[in-house]
Amino acid sequence: MNPNQKIIAIGSASLGILILNVILHVVSIIVTVLVLNNNGTGLNCNRTIIREYNETVRVERITQWYNTSTIEYIERPSNEYYMNNTEPLCEAQGFAPFSKDNGIRIGSRGHVFVIREPFVSCSPSECRTFFLTQGSLLNDKHSNGTMKDRSPYRTLMSVKIGQSPNVYQARFEAVAWSATACHDGKKWMTVGVTGPDNQAVAVVNYGGVPVDIINSWAGDILRTQESSCTCIKGDCYWVMTDGPANRQAKYRIFKAKDGRIIGQTDISFNGGHIEECSCYPNEGKVECICRDNWTGTNRPILVISSDLSYTVGYLCAGIPTDTPRGEDSQFTGSCTSPLGNKGYGVKGFGFRQGTDVWAGRTISRTSRSGFEIIKIRNGWTQNSKDQIRRQVIIDNLNWSGYSGSFTLPVELTKKGCLVPCFWVEMIRGKPEETTIWTSSSSIVMCGVDHKIASWSWHDGAILPFDIDKM
């Protein structure tokens, strides 16, 4: 075979192989398309991934097809029903730990907000910790002077319960130096108070959007609960104060639907003082235990009906639960009048259990240190001193602070009753410690049908921080 014949033979063979390759590729494509059309959902190469972002952003649907991705944004379905919340409170024999954020310990080296007034509130699908930031981080120069209650830098933010109040997981809620928040079953409602002391404004947000406002009506530091508001059958209730902290002020109950105020009523309470109420739903009504910052070491009680009628008085128990306070043995108790003649006070809480009451208080009578919850037989209706249960949450060697109530809805627990829960703030820094800042962490407890041993779930951060030594 001469050279020309060899070239022709090799070329013919190559052309034949090429044609065969093309035919095989065409057949392969046809078969693949036919199979995918007939049974596309059964192959691993075609899959759908659903990711959900926070509460109100979107659902992202990604369909992956070999090396091609198609991204489609669809509306996130909203919750269809309002929560009922007319069930009774569950009977609690003790309180078990639910969460602890350790924010200050983590904040010594993490990006954690300087906060105060943390509180917890729950939706049908989750519980969140809300807190008022100071627009600054722990162990940073902007934390200097954060003992101040009211500033233009304060904002209400939230994280999923148990998370520290860090910059990476926190969600902005409102501009506020006083606040409340609750979920009606469909969306979150927040009330954030901000502005100058004599003309403060409360902005009502629903689903993250401003819907209504409340202007100061007494011109003296309009303020609200610093704990969860209460929603029953789609109507949400909260209490506000406007006026002096050390004498008679003005108090109002507000009612909103979908974030729009549909009712309000003034509370007549001459001689009494109401601030920072801790409220919860119970048998279709809103029950609140509040703070008397004027004279009483017993706590005001407020029970609100759906038509905004109310009863107001004081926790009857013959054991005082505010701080500062006198000796238990010297306190008689009253259902109608403030007793104790001790000014100032601290936000606190309690739960009615029939005619009994669970009531939280600091262990110290004079300072915000230690924390215990006690059960007083007939303490809701009588001047009883019969303490039938006591559980220590924080020992008296460690700082506590505000405390407040919330409930776990039946949608979360699948019970036929509302689980009573509470949180305790643990304040660190100024004025008790040598730092340039004031902040706090929290421990959260929920009622169970067993006795729980006392212990100390204290903050545990080692102070001062590096910034305090400069």
UniProtKB/Swiss-Prot annotation:
The gene is NA. Catalyzes the removal of terminal sialic acid residues from viral and cellular glycoconjugates. Cleaves off the terminal sialic acids on the glycosylated HA during virus budding to facilitate virus release. Additionally helps virus spread through the circulation by further removing sialic acids from the cell surface. These cleavages prevent self-aggregation and ensure the efficient spread of the progeny virus from cell to cell. Otherwise, infection would be limited to one round of replication. GO terms for cellular component: host cell plasma membrane; membrane; virion membrane. Its EC number is 3.2.1.18. Ca(2+) binds at D292, G296, D322. The keyword Zinc does not apply. SUPFAM superfamilies: Sialidases. It comes from Influenza A virus (strain A/Equine/Alaska/1/1991 H3N8). It is found in: Virion membrane; Host apical cell membrane. It comes from the Viruses. InterPro entries: Glyco_hydro_34 (IPR001860), Sialidase_sf (IPR036278). The chain crosses the membrane at residues 15-35. Substrate binds at R116, R150, E275, E276, R291, R368. Residues 1-14 are intravirion. One of its GO terms (molecular function) is metal ion binding. HAMAP family: INFV_NRAM. Inhibited by the neuraminidase inhibitors zanamivir (Relenza) and oseltamivir (Tamiflu). These drugs interfere with the release of progeny virus from infected cells and are effective against all influenza strains. Resistance to neuraminidase inhibitors is quite rare. Homotetramer. Residues 32-86 are annotated as: Hypervariable stalk region. The keyword Cytoplasm does not apply. Residues 89-470 are annotated as: Head of neuraminidase. This is Neuraminidase. The active site is at D149, Y402.
